[in-house]
Amino acid sequence: MSKSIELLVKLHNPKCVSIETTGRGGVALLYKEQIICAFAQAENKYMLGYHLLMSKYRQEKSSREFVDSYVDAWCEEFGHPKHASEALKYVVDMICDLPLPSQLRHIKALRKRYLRSQYAHLSALDRANKMAEENGLSANSVEARQLRIRELNDLRKSNTCPRCRGTGEVGRVQKHKCPECDGTGKLKATIYHLMKSINCTEAYFKRYLNALVVAFERHCYEEMSGAESVIKQRLNKEISD
């Protein structure tokens, strides 16, 4: 996922009728009708990918409901085994950077330890302000405020590492790799977190679910990549025209 498309999805609700985006220096490049059209084309050609983007970057409830119903239909159509639907929905959580149930206790402890200070959220706000500045957005604009809200929500609800607050580094004077997330900025779930969350044995998972999980995850990323490409191509065409 390119940063430009991620930012576009975060900033603009495709259902909104009053969006206008700005380029660097505040010069208008794309208008609401163009953005809405690009999103509509992505939804038409890669419906799952579109709703995954909305689920990941906008936390759209309706999009997540669509993805969950897609998983149920997928499992029903191919007659997948016990735990399949639950496992694939957790795969969606992993793709959307949400913690799995087996991670919650550890993440909750880290949040309690590192996010209690009144200054704990400053890095998230700084990151949002930097993104707004790089994209020519006024600090007091609606879009900039949306970015700040989403960065704070990511810190509180996603698998963003509470210790480094998503930067991957700790230390005030001499920076070094965060030991909690191994420098990634995310406490990413593993297959073992997935197995523990659905309460199944490793032997059962490898025999009945592993190939399904791998195939579905690949399918999701292909759909997201396809939706992103449609949005990029459409907007590039609008700009060049």
How should each PLM-predicted stretch be described?
Residues 1-141:
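N-terminal alpha-helical interaction blocks
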